[in-house]
Amino acid sequence: LDDLRADRHQFALDLRRPLPPEPRAAGRLGTVFHDAVAQRLSARGTLFGLGQAGVPDSLGPQDRDRIERWLETAENLPLLEDYVLAETETDREITIGATTLRCRMDAVFHRLDGSGWLIVDWKTGRRQVPVDQLSVYVHAWAASQGVPTGSVRAAYVYVDYPGGRVDELTAAGLLDLDQIESALTPGSPPDEMTPLPAPEQQG
């Protein structure tokens, strides 16, 4: 929640998911990947080419190679072992205090034995995001399923790193609703905010 620490108002606006910024080449490639990985992971065990995954023929060879590498990274993630894809690009809303937040989750997986959930936010770039921002997703999903937050995992997955980089939200790093509400309360002076834990650094 670095953005929150710097500018509470802007952070609240970002959480409400305003209109996306103007598309750039990297952003368009990321969008293609998000669509393709949903197709690939929902068809595990099936031979699935880029065309079948919805990757447009208009992409150049370098971009197609990059998409394929990202998809292979996602498919081979140890994080996803024992999980099956449940939903992609799914929205959930949660009201915290006087603020209603809309969360769009890239992918949600269900553990095969039914014992828990895993939220994944795919990142095709390498700029790392503080993992405690996933706390809002965890609370929103847990509330929508009527399950405790302890049964919901969440992680950023950076697919551009060799083998993928996983930054998972730990139980200790999960912000509670009071902390999030305090952070979103307009007009609260910074010294009245509940202290926010620093994100845990993972290798």
Where are these regions (language model features)?
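Anion-coordinating catalytic cores for phosphoryl-, nucleotidyl-, and glycosidic chemistry
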Residues: 1-25, 33, 42-48, 90-99, ...
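A broad structural signal for short, well-ordered beta-strand segments within beta-sheet-rich domains
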Residues: 81-87, 106, 114, 148-152
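Residue-level recognition of conserved beta-strand positions in structured domain cores
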Residues: 15, 121-122, 156
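A non-catalytic, helix-rich entry segment at domain boundaries
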Residues: 16, 21-96
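Metal-dependent nuclease catalytic regions and adjoining charged, substrate-binding loops involved
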Residues: 67, 88-90, 141-203
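Short, solvent-exposed loop/turn segments at secondary-structure junctions
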Residues: 18, 125, 161-162
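Non-catalytic protein-protein interaction segments used by genome-maintenance enzymes to assemble
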Residues: 91-144
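Generic recognition of stable, solvent-exposed alpha-helical segments in well-folded globular domains
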Residues: 24, 28-35, 62, 102-103, ...
